[in-house]
Amino acid sequence: MSNKETCGFQTEVKQLLQLMIHSLYSNKEIFLRELISNASDAADKLRFKALSAPELYEGDGDLKVRISFDDKKGTLTVSDNGIGMTREQAVDHLGTIAKSGTKEFLSALGNDQAKDSQLIGQFGVGFYSAFIVADKVEVRSRAAGVAADKGVLWASAGEGEYSVENIEKKDRGTEITLFLREDEKEFLNEWRLREIIGKYSDHIGLPVEILTKEYDEEGKESGVKWEKINKAQALWTRSKAEISDDEYKEFYKHISHDFADPLSWMHNKVEGNQEYTSLLYVPGKAPWDLFNREQKHGLKLYVQRVFIMDDAEVFMPNYLRFMRGLLDSNDLPLNVSREILQDNKTTAALRKALTKRSLQMLEKLAKDEPEKYAVFWKEFGLVLKEGVAEDFANKEQIAKLYRFASTHTDSSEQNVSFEDYISRMKEGQKAVYYITADSYVAAKNSPHLELFNKKGIEVLLLSDRIDEWMLSYLTEFDGKPLQSVTKADLDLGDLADKEEENQKEQDEKFDSFIQRVKSLLGERVKDVRITHRLTDTPAVVSTDNDQMTTQMAKLFAMSGQPVPEVKYTFEINPQHELVKKAAKVTDETEFGDWIELLLNQAMLAERGSLENPVAFIKLVNALLAK
């Protein structure tokens, strides 16, 4: 019956085991939390399947987790009577990691123990955490609904391989036995185990029982009994007033498998047209796969306290995919499926309500705890920027949450909101001015800012890759248009001063110069014109309002899409000494060299690169040698 075979671990499992034992050793007691959490999940899955197949309970519907130890053998056992596993499932779940992006995750790990610990926690170590304290682990399991002789024994020393064989197992569920290392015998102590379970698993909605000794009236040991040691009431069903912050934090870690505390949470019970309870969390750290579109996200879904599914993504818009938590609805049917959820009025109403609550949470965090919000923005700001394109109904509320670097702060930290900017707008200023660039340094030092710096007009400095795309959906805020300072047809309106209005005479002197430049460059540029927006720079290139910007063209190129040709307007500063010098050159070849120099400088400042940098270097060298 044994049919024993020995298999090698998947490469990624080997790596994860080695890294985990090294990185998580200082927080080793979490292995018990992880194993109890898995047992709780197994019970949830059995309850769900038994909705349509009650015979799976096999006459034992009293679901629980049990913990026992044998100090003589040095073993600790965690068992449950949940869904159980077949032989194939044991191999799939315990011998391989099925998550997409695992290789990328492992490559992100380095030698920083604290950082690695956080990353591994986010990835979800689950069962493998047993090897932090054990040098051998045995798993005995039988799936619900299969014969007793279809049990499986999986065993490993956590090194390169594991064995798997068929066994007879009378009881449904899974039993995990840890053979503890010599220096981990502290976990063979009932009070130590009670302490850990009280700390990490008191909120589990499943009884956690420990095998404890019984004593007679004379104090002599008379036997053993199973004793429940947790509240065994689903945390979200309890009154908010009786739940401590620590309990909320530990429950977050239970449902998210994160090691870090959440930044914020909101617990609501709603009655009326809809009846549901929601418990939403804002994590403190972005998961390693936040930008992996294939990775599932969403809330845990319960219907009338019965677990239905993990990652019910339909209740949260994609731009809030970082939110964690659960929804317990009284209005959805118990036999609900992902397909039914997709096209359901109740679902749509719940999604709308939960989106609103999530945005309110973030608004409150930004207002009441700006330091925590700064952490949130650093971790999740890029994802939130997708919101104005996805959620038109909440566009203004989402944009209110955005933060940017600004010329006002002289710092790369993104901590300026649109409301901050508007509160500092100059008298007569009608627009919110911004610039997009590849980096904060490039934005801050752009020649397009020279006039704004001179006049003391604040400009938002945007350097995230998504910014240009975001701005194509967000053209105004609070009735104020958002205006790029790089546009050729930039209009400062009432902020234009008399000095600029009286420069026509000077412009006329340069008319013939401008015509020479136009003739020389021809179709290479859209237009050539005099500009007074520059103070220290001889020339810039700019695009019209209806043209694709440089940053958007770069986005297209990076995504492999065809990029329309961008023809720039060449703007020349008549006050600059280089321009004055070029205007005096009569030799057409030399004049062409000077104009080529000015145009290439402007293109380099705008785009960050040139099509032919070698030719530009030769040109600069030739002019310097004269």
Swiss-Prot record:
InterPro entries in alphabetical order: HATPase_C_sf, Heat_shock_protein_90_CS, HSP90_C, Hsp90_fam, Hsp90_N, Ribosomal_Su5_D2-typ_SF
SMART domains: HATPase_c
Positions of the UniProt region annotated as A: 1-338
Region feature C, mapped onto this chain: 555-626
Similarity field: Belongs to the heat shock protein 90 family.
Subunit structure: Homodimer.
Protein name: Chaperone protein HtpG
